[in-house]
């Protein structure tokens, strides 16, 4: 650590206990982050931290970023958020769903501090929310999966039965079916975002069921390692996982928070920030498709990229009718597109998936 | 339908980290020491093993280094409990905290690197899996048929008596703690080198705690550890297999079941010992108690 | 008005009942209370997870796991008593618990029995102390305390039951008890010390940009030293004179 930083850190200490930041004009904008995992998790938190680094790179001396990592959801989160606010951060990013209520509570106590909460649905005057349309990426994965499977069985390792994951399962299934009407989808729930041993077991269970393409919604590389052993293929999740390329990792779905973070910090700097809910996808650069490797035939790659482009241009929505619910009742009529409200509360599988969502 | 053999083969490899860690803890506990730091030793082993395997390109050297690292970090616990007479439960918890932090700190440069490939052994199953299974009869033999094992059990049952008979209680216990650390280290390294093929912070994700439960379930026998590891691992593997086959399963209840089974086993064995005064063993007599020679 | 006190009572009762499981298994069958309660930790976690995904799931929560947030129901919440301090009713209750435990252990005959049974079980038995009663009393009481601690968290800072509720506070409490040398006031101080390392750890991340792992290592080492040097307070070092 250099001397300037040390001085800066000493300067913070007297500021603790004051609710409002002092000298906001002269000083660089302080941006705080609270992470649910360690920055070294190679997945969710790692990607958010890349976003933080992108802010520093973009704005240089005009911003100063700090983070607190591995904060458990629940009681500890509120304390950590208060500390970030007390330390003079004017913009705070809370990057896990479980931080939702703590953010709302702390935001009420610090009306001058702006909060950004990832993946939640509660907003306030000074609390904005943001999320990424991961299902758009899943549509591309589903297309590749449907084309690549030889056993016509694809597997999905779910973390928790929440709307984001259910969207992902539906989206990948719909698009796999579109290119391969015989495809079947097997779903297992790991009940964890990160548990390598269990994820490996989940992948093995799918492989033993005859699955040869695995989509994962959990963050470790264990399913890819299992896929490699069994000669199956899979996709990187959250981060690129490119060290498993070209096979078993044939592509990946990457969370890229940098564009959003840079945009929002810029808005705070020029005074145009306001609370809103942002749900961007491939078009906004939030959801990236990692390089499709040579293990995928060229025409499949082309088809996948074409789908990606049509989603990016807004020409195509992955949830476009006709689509029925699992029980056969009609959900979307021909040409009808799912609304964001429907998607953000999604709690059913589409027709054709045989697995049940656990109650 | 679900083919039992495939479930079993899956189970063999899935339960290996826990088999190692639990066998190590078994020996430690039979010497009368309750080390709750298994999770911490496992993750240190996972990191050290991965680092060594990556640096040398040899998974085998990785496992050796993991064993050494696990044993080394367990010596802090040995120091505290055997020389400084600190409480074993608290020291073990501190060891877990320390190990998790230490591994995370030193693991930073290794993030995102892939482990070197391993040559599979018989039945396309990793050699380490077979080694874990081979350790079961070896440890059984050591505990029940060898003189050294007899002394170790004596120390664990009644350290005052063992001391009076002239056995070096402290040395026996330190050795047992070190062995437990080495085994936990290998178990952790199996996760990073053979299952995930990558180092990630916090990758043991509670495996050490399961190993502790299995030792209780095993009624402190080597064969029981294997049965316990297969039961605990089996429940997970089976519920995932059922899910994959499209059967709805009550996951929370299923994953609770092995722990309830452990309590029932513990109660049955204790009751047998209490009321019949014959056979049946429960926890080693001096488990968790510190020893100091009065003279 | 009465809802929150009733919740505290129910929390204590729940903790007491959970604590009585190892106590009774110990008394009836001689099963080790350490091991039984260790196993019960996992069972309790699964029960909480089941509740968060099942019966207690917030119907307005868009399918996310977790109960309704109690902070939005003033009658059932445990708010900050003094704004900005984070102090809630749990702080008051903890202070009272320290006093009550001190009185129990140092001034009450039952506390004397507990200490006697801890130091010399056989002697205590001869003096007419029934170990079964003590086991049930102590485990039940500590269960009730732990239950209240959980309730104050769930109704206060955490606000809701989630699948990850708990995050290791119970194990930290064991460390605190030993650091406090099993004395109520010592435990209060040890609790404050550990809390300081948590908060200080976050501050260190913020101001010095240390990774969380450094803080964890520091905590581990702090505990090692404190536990290790406890020896010097309990034993006197003596130079052995060899003739």
Task: List PLM regions with ranges.
Chain A
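N-terminal secretory signal peptides and thylakoid transit peptides that target proteins
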Residues: 1-11
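N-terminal signal peptide c-region/cleavage motif recognized by signal peptidases
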Residues: 19-21
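A residue-level marker of the well-folded mature domains of exported/periplasmic proteins
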Residues: 24-359
């Amino acid at each position: 650590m250099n001397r300037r930083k040390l001085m800066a850190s000493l300067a913070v200490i007297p500021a603790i206990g004051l609710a409002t930041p002092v000298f906001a004009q002269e000083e660089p904008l302080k941006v705080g982050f609270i992470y649910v995992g360690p920055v070294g998790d190679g997945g969710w938190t790692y990607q958010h931290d890349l976003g933080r680094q992108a802010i520093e790179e973009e704005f240089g001396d005009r911003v100063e970023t700090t983070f607190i990592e591995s904060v458990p959801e629940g009681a500890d989160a509120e304390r950590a958020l208060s500390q970030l606010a007390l330390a003079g951060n004017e913009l705070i990013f809370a990057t896990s769903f479980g931080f939702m209520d703590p953010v709302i509570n702390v935001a009420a106590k610090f009306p001058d501090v702006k909060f950004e909460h990832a993946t939640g649905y509660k907003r306030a005057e000074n609390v904005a929310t943001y999320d990424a349309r991961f299902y758009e990426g899943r549509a591309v994965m589903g297309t590749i999966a449907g084309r690549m499977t030889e056993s016509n069985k694809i597997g999905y390792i779910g973390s928790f039965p929440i709307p984001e994951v259910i969207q992902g399962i539906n989206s990948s299934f719909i698009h796999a079916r579109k290119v391969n009407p015989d495809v079947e989808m097997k779903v297992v729930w790991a009940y964890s975002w990160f548990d390598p041993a269990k994820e490996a077991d989940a992948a093995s269970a799918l492989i033993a069921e005859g699955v040869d393409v695995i989509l994962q919604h959990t963050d470790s590389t264990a399913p890819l390692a299992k896929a490699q052993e069994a000669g199956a293929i899979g996709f990187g999740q959250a981060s690129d996982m490119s060290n498993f390329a070209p096979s078993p990792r044939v592509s990946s779905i990457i969370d890229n928070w940098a564009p959003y973070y840079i945009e929002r910090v810029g808005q705070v700097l020029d005074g145009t920030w306001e609370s809103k809910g942002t749900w961007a996808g491939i078009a906004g650069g939030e959801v990236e498709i990692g390089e499709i490797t040579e293990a995928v035939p060229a025409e499949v790659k082309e088809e996948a990229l074409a789908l990606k482009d049509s989603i990016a241009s807004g020409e195509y929505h992955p949830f476009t009718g006709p689509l029925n619910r699992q029980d056969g009742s009609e959900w979307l009529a021909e040409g009808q597109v799912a609304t964001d409200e429907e998607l953000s509360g999604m709690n059913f599988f589409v027709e054709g998936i045989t697995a049940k969502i656990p109650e | 339908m679900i083919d039992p053999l495939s479930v079993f083969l899956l189970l063999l490899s899935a339960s290996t980290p826990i088999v190692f860690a639990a066998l190590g803890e078994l020996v430690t506990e039979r010497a009368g020491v309750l080390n709750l730091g298994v999770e911490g030793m496992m993750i240190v082993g996972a990191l050290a093993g991965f680092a060594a395997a990556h640096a040398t390109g040899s998974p085998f050297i990785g496992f050796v280094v993991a064993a050494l690292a696990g044993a080394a970090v367990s010596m802090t616990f040995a120091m505290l409990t055997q020389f400084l007479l600190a409480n074993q439960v608290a020291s073990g918890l501190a060891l877990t905290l320390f190990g998790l932090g230490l591994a995370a700190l030193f693991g930073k440069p290794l993030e995102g690197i892939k482990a070197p490939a391993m040559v599979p052994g018989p039945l396309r199953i990793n050699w380490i899996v077979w080694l874990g299974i081979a350790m079961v009869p070896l440890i059984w033999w050591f505990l029940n048929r060898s003189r050294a094992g007899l002394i170790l059990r004596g120390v664990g049952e009644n350290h005052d008596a063992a001391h009076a008979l002239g056995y070096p209680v402290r040395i026996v216990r330190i050795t047992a703690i070190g062995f437990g650390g080495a085994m936990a280290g290998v178990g952790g390294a199996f996760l990073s080198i053979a299952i995930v093929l990558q180092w990630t912070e916090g990758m043991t994700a509670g495996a050490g705690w399961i190993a502790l439960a299995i030792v209780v379930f095993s009624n402190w026998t080597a064969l029981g550890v294997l049965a316990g590891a297969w039961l605990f691992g089996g429940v997970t593997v089976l519920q995932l297999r059922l899910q994959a086959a499209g059967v709805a399963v009550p996951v929370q209840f299923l994953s609770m079941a092995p722990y309830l089974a452990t309590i029932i086993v513990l109660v049955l064995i204790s009751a047998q010992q209490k009321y019949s005064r014959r056979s049946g063993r429960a926890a080693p007599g001096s488990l968790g108690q510190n020893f100091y020679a009065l003279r | 008005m009465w809802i929150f006190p009733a919740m505290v009572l129910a929390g204590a009762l729940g903790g007491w009942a959970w604590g009585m499981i190892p106590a009774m298994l110990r008394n009836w069958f001689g099963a080790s209370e350490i091991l039984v309660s260790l196993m019960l930790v996992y069972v309790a976690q699964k029960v909480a997870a089941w509740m968060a995904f099942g019966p207690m799931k917030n119907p307005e929560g868009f399918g996310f796991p977790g109960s309704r947030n109690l902070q939005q129901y003033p009658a059932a919440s445990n708010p900050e008593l003094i704004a900005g301090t984070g102090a809630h009713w749990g702080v008051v209750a903890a202070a009272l618990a320290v006093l009550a435990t001190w009185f129990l252990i140092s001034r009450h005959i039952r506390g004397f029995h507990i200490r006697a049974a801890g130091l010399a079980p056989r002697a205590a038995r001869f003096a007419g102390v029934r170990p079964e009663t003590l086991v049930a009393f102590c485990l039940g009481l500590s269960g009730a305390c732990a239950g209240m601690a959980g309730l104050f968290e769930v109704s206060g800072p955490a606000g809701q039951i989630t699948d990850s509720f708990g995050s290791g506070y119970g194990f930290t409490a064991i460390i605190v008890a030993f650091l406090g040398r099993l004395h109520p006031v010592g435990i209060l101080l040890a609790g404050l010390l550990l809390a300081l390392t948590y908060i200080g750890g976050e501050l260190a991340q913020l101001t010095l940009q240390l990774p969380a792992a450094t803080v964890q290592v520091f905590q581990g080492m702090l505990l090692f030293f404190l536990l290790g040097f406890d020896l010097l307070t309990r034993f006197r070092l003596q130079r052995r004179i060899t003739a």
